[in-house]
């Protein structure tokens, strides 16, 4: 079903697995996509043919809502970044590496973020980290790197900065970030979309 919707886009698109995804199902549905249909345990990849390099990083931890960046994935990232030290780079990953203040979602956060930070401290070419998972738009400066979480394409959660109960779904609009690449850096615009309800 996802592929039929994405095929309506006029732009190229690249996918990373989220916490509800199954790698094998994703590979089967997008077998002709080199960055997904390839071999290997994880769906990590680079896209090199744009003015800024894109790196998709797989944070999936099967059977868990949480994500993980294990040593194997971090070694791959470190090697990949080392091989192109001067190429401006965007990282894409599902689970954000920071504490958001949303207690229920933070319990389902990213394991391995300390080692992830150690890798990134060696690589100043990473200009931004783009994430999902929180079902809310959130931005922070993490390890001196702008880190943005996009809205969900399905449901948004009520902003609850202290409650332990399950997140409440609310009819806020979804949206998207549009990143404008300039010589000075990245400029991010937020576009809210009409609700489909």
Predicted regions and their residues:
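Short glycine-enriched, charge-decorated loop/helix-capping segments at active-site entrances
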Residues: 63, 102-109, 163-166
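Structural motif
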Residues: 54-56, 90-92, 130
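Active-site-proximal segments of metal-dependent phosphoesterases and phosphodiesterases across multiple
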Residues: 68, 86-127, 158
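Extended active-site neighborhood of metal-dependent phosphoesterases/phosphodiesterases
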Residues: 1-76, 83, 115-125, 143, ...
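Histidine-centered divalent metal-coordination motifs
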Residues: 19-20, 94, 133-135
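A short C-terminal boundary segment appended to hydrolase-like catalytic domains
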Residues: 174-197
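Hydrophobic/aromatic residues located in beta-strands of well-ordered beta-sheets
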Residues: 13-15, 89, 129, 147
